Regions:
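Left-handed beta-helix
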Residues: 2, 7-8, 13-14, 19-20, ...
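Phosphate/pyrophosphate-binding betaalpha-module
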Residues: 36
Length: 107
């Protein structure tokens, strides 16, 4: 049984698939309007983060991922057990492997 949590003020719109035990925190935006977003099990999208897509760039996020406060993940792939640091920006076509750390504020 899925126990996903979507905090007050968070927005999840469009073509979004979520695994189990996913948490989307305050004022985060997950917007799959022009392509699909897939979010794996036990992934944590922290406050004010944005997950978005572009027409030819869906977004796929693995299992056990943390997307830090204010990070932007746009049209890319993020592998399992990866941390996207606070305020980091990951752009169209990027592919981040498993067990990686993207530092806070990185582009």
């Amino acid at each position: 049984m899925s126990k996903n949590y979507i905090a007050e003020g968070a927005v999840v719109k469009g073509k979004v698939q979520m695994g189990e035990d996913v948490s989307i925190w305050y004022n985060a935006t997950v917007r799959g309007d022009s392509a699909e977003i897939k979010i794996g099990d036990r992934t944590n999208v922290q406050d004010n983060a944005v997950i978005h897509v572009d027409t030819h760039y869906p977004t796929t996020i693995g299992n056990g991922v943390t997307i830090g406060h204010g990070a932007i993940v746009h049209g890319c792939t993020v592998g399992d057990n990866t941390l996207i640091g606070m305020g980091a920006i990951v752009l169209n076509g990027a592919s981040i492997g498993e067990n990686c750390i993207i530092g806070a504020g990185a582009l």
